[in-house]
Amino acid sequence: ETGLKTATEVANKDHVKLALEHDIDMLWIGARSTVSPFIIQEIADELEGTDKIVLVKNPVNPDLALWIGAIERLQRANIKNLGVIHRGFSTYEKTKYRNIPEWQLVIELQNKFPLLPLICDPSHITGKRDLIFDVSQTALDLNFDGLMIETHCTPDEAWSDAAQQVTPAQLVQIMKDLRIRKTSVAEEDYLSQLGTLRSHIDILDDQLLDLLKKRMEIAEEIGKLKKANNVA
């Protein structure tokens, strides 16, 4: 009715069969499937030789080898239109993100597969709609190829992940506010590399500030413990 492309997550060969039968345009493999070589192989066997777009989300935990292994299994299945989705990684620590970005791991993946399309999922990384823009801009500054942002007509009434969804109007505004570096062909490579390196520094600065914050919190706990035990 709309002419829009359709996409769905597949977690086993039966999902793949149904998706192909209904001519779904794009398939993605979720983070919890990426962790299992057995599931990935099952999906790869069913998709062998397909020209459908197939995207692989990073595994739940920050394990680059698992992510690479999943990509290589799908490559061996001669999947012609393969890409990856960065949705962040789970952590036991409390941070402002639902899933920490660990941008350095994605940069390593980019270096290994420079021609592989890379999509960022800021909705799952942030878990909060008010952080989506900043993470999206960081992804574009790191030369990501696209974004996967959750939208809902009435986000607060969504059955799942309500806090990380935006209205269509909010999505339009996010897209308008995002900036993509535009340069001449002669300058493009230099400025792209320079911008990426500067983004790397920004990421490291954020990590350092986060570590210092955690250090201060621990020092404060030590102070409270000493005070409670009357220790100078």
Regions found by a protein language model. Give the residues of each.
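Glycine-rich, proline-tolerant flexible connector loops at the mouths of alpha/beta enzymes
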Residues: 1, 152-163, 222-231
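Active-site beta->alpha loop and helix N-cap motifs at the rims of alpha/beta catalytic domains
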Residues: 1-41
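A structural motif corresponding to the C-terminal end of an alpha-helix
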Residues: 2-4, 112-116, 178-181
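Generic detector of well-ordered alpha-helical packing
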Residues: 10, 122, 151, 203-206
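Receiver (REC) domain switch/active-site residues of two-component response regulators
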Residues: 24-25, 145, 205
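Catalytic alpha/beta core domains of metabolic enzymes, predominantly
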Residues: 37-170
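C-terminal active-site "lid" helix and adjoining low-complexity regulatory extension at the edge
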Residues: 168-180
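Extended, charge-rich alpha-helical interface modules
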Residues: 178-232
